[in-house]
């Protein structure tokens, strides 16, 4: 046991994450969630679990080989013990997914939307299906029987396969068929209903004839999950390569990493499981059976086959992000930011406002440079368009593009090439430190001198996810914040991770210490009987130093409210340890993604928004930025948002001291915070500007120059 830590109020990060994913799964079992959205929650749960095995389980497997006696500082478990616990907790989740999928499928069948088993079809339907199979599927299949002339093939990560146990003259062989990529996954049957069969079911049903010299003893749909845990900075870097070329090689390497999970659909697969376990060196605890399809991505296309009325009743009501309440349509975004600080709240506010800022800056004669950090982008990114346009217009454009953003590497590599071709200067992050911060600095010059527009956000510059994730985007013309941002980009360009800043908290140099300093300040207030309090909203909490400081503050009497969507390694309500800490989690229509850190009470509250969770990887091993909110108006807006989220008793759940979550009591004035913000954004969205407003900005806005910081 590790005697350096107190484990009485902490828990394992992997098991905490599995609890989060269970909350996602249980959204699919809620009657008040529209039927097609319940299907999507099933797919989100499945995709989350896939990535968990690729990243976390893959990493722990490697750890077990290298540091088998290492003990986790939050749970005191060794890697082997963690893997055992993960398997023990994941198996019931498969069973729960099967149960919920079957339930949702029955409800859809009542609406004549049904996944059919071929055995159930009428003779004529089977005949038509076979005709389709022979014409469209059979020509693109590549069946293999493993033998001396056909060695065991590489099975790609997360690609469905048909595995078969074949018998010929008492000799047992193994056959495998990969699902073709370019064939529709759902094949709809003729008729008025929306009955369909899945591609893998068709191949499974008709594939016996592909092995006519054999007797098929067993056959099943299966899927291999491979580790994606590969650190580009740990691999051999050839001096003749640029970093982009190096990353392309890394992506290819990932495809061939060690299998960490085998999934098999159905029940008849005893010999298949035994054979693959030996060939792939996968232990029994890493093999999972499922009654639900192993890949649920097809569910997103189901709504294409239903009527407008069915879509209306079966999906969330379509929502178009509103224009932000603080902006007047038709008036220069730049001029409005020069007048006062602005805050966008996604997905309720539109990201178009920020894109318009880039568009204006790309054309503005006063713009000298645009500097931006990019972690993830949409597949079709207008942000890139305007950065390229700025460079082509003679502006200096510096893009710090993080090529190591997991599973977005190829997209970022492609965009880095486009940006370079347009004349942008592109940097590829920092060695050993991912650049995860969200900072954009626009430097301008007029007759009065240099001035800045700075944007700092909690989420990515991704126009797609900005409609699905809750995030904050802060925009200011503060000279002091702009100067800090300018120092930040200078430090990044010169590989200086230990720079000093007057206002921003920047990891790895000052973020962790800055947060701890503010926790300690609230602790000192409590000890001297002054009003105090801490609110933290984040995706995950794993940083052991932060956890221990929160425990100390709790013991001193500081009321602490933690709103943590995912991993939470602190257990609240432990007497003498965390009894003044309350932890809640909101899981709903939108993915909670904003990070807000508030210290103090009332008008004296100090508020930061950040790209960083309180995870050691963020506070010590990444480049992150937290920005202070000084404007009293914006502070009050964020404090109101915090109060609404605290009142949420529909989507919020409470973490108990034993690590389990429970629902909150219902009231007469029930609160769903996401719906509240959605309706509020619609209600407060600005109308077209009046002639009076337009004249005001024409006269006043043109004279805006350098702007001093509005302090608390």
Please tell me what each predicted stretch does.
Residues 544-547, 551:
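Glycine/threonine-rich ATP-lid/beta-loop region of ATP-binding domains
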């Amino acid at each position: 046991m590790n005697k350096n830590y107190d484990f009485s109020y902490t828990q394992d990060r992997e098991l905490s994450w599995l609890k989060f994913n269970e909350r996602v799964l249980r959204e699919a079992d809620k009657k008040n969630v529209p039927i097609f959205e319940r299907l999507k929650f099933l797919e989100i749960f499945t995709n989350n679990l896939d990535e968990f095995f690729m990243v976390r389980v893959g990493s722990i497997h490697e750890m077990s080989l290298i540091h088998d006696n290492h003990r986790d500082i939050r749970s005191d478990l060794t890697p082997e013990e963690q893997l055992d616990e993960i398997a023990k907790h994941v198996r019931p989740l498969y069973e729960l997914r099967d149960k919920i999928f079957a339930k949702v499928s029955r409800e859809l069948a009542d609406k004549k939307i049904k996944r059919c088993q071929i055995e159930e079809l009428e003779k004529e339907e089977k005949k038509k299906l076979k005709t389709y199979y022979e014409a469209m599927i059979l020509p693109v299949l590549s069946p293999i029987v493993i033998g001396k002339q056909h060695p065991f093939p590489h099975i790609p990560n997360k690609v469905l396969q048909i595995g078969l146990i074949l018998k010929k003259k008492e000799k047992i062989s193994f056959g495998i068929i990969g699902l073709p990529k370019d064939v529709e996954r759902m094949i709809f049957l003729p008729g008025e209903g929306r009955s369909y069969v899945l591609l893998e079911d068709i191949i499974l049903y008709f594939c016996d004839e592909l092995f006519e010299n054999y007797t098929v003893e067993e056959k099943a749909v299966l899927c291999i999950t491979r580790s994606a845990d590969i650190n580009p900075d740990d691999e051999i870097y050839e001096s003749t390569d640029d970093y982009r070329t190096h990353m392309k090689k890394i992506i290819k390497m990932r495809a061939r990493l060690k299998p960490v999970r085998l999934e098999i659909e159905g029940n008849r697969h005893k010999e298949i499981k035994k054979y693959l376990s030996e060939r792939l060196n996968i232990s029994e605890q890493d093999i999972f059976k499922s009654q639900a399809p192993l890949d649920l991505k097809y569910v997103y296309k189901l709504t294409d086959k239903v009527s407008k009325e069915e879509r209306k009743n079966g999906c969330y009501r379509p929502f178009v992000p509103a224009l932000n309440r603080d902006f007047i349509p038709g008036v220069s975004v730049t001029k409005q930011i020069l007048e006062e600080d602005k805050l966008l709240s996604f997905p309720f506010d539109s990201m178009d406002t920020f894109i318009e800022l880039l568009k204006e800056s790309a054309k503005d004669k006063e713009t000298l440079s645009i500097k931006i950090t990019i972690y993830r982008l949409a597949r079709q990114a207008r942000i890139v368009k305007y950065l390229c346009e700025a460079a082509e217009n003679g502006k200096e454009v510096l893009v710090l593009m993080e090529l190591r953003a997991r599973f977005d590497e190829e997209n970022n590599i492609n965009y880095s090439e486009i940006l370079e071709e347009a004349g942008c200067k592109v940097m590829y992050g920092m060695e050993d430190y991912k650049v995860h911060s969200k900072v954009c600095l626009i430097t301008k010059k007029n007759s009065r001198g240099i001035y800045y527009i700075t944007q700092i956000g909690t989420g990515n510059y991704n126009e797609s996810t900005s409609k699905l994730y809750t995030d904050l985007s802060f925009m200011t013309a503060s000279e002091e914040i702009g100067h800090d941002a300018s120092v930040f980009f200078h430090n990044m360009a010169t590989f200086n991770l230990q720079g000093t800043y007057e206002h921003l908290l920047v990891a790895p140099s000052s973020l962790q210490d800055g947060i701890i300093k503010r926790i300690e300040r609230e602790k000192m207030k409590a000890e001297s009987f002054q009003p105090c309090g801490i609110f933290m909203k984040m995706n995950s909490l794993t940083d052991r130093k932060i956890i221990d400081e929160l425990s100390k503050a709790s013991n001193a009497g500081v009321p602490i409210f933690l709103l943590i969507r995912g991993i939470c390694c602190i257990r609240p309500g432990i007497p003498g340890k965390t009894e003044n800490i309350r932890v809640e989690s909101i899981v709903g229509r939108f993915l909670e993604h904003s990070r807000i850190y508030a210290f103090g009470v009332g008008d004296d509250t100090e508020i930061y928004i950040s790209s960083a969770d309180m995870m050691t990887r963020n506070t010590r091993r990444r480049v992150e930025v937290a920005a202070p909110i000084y404007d009293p108006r914006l502070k009050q807006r964020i404090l109101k948002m915090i109060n609404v989220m605290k009142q949420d008793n529909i989507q919020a759940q409470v973490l108990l001291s034993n690590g389990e979550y429970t629902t909150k009591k219902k009231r007469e004035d029930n609160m769903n915070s996401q719906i509240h913000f959605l309706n509020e954004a619609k209600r407060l969205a600005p109308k077209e500007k009046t002639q009076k407003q337009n004249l005001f900005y024409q006269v006043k806005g043109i004279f805006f120059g350098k702007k001093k910081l509005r302090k608390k």
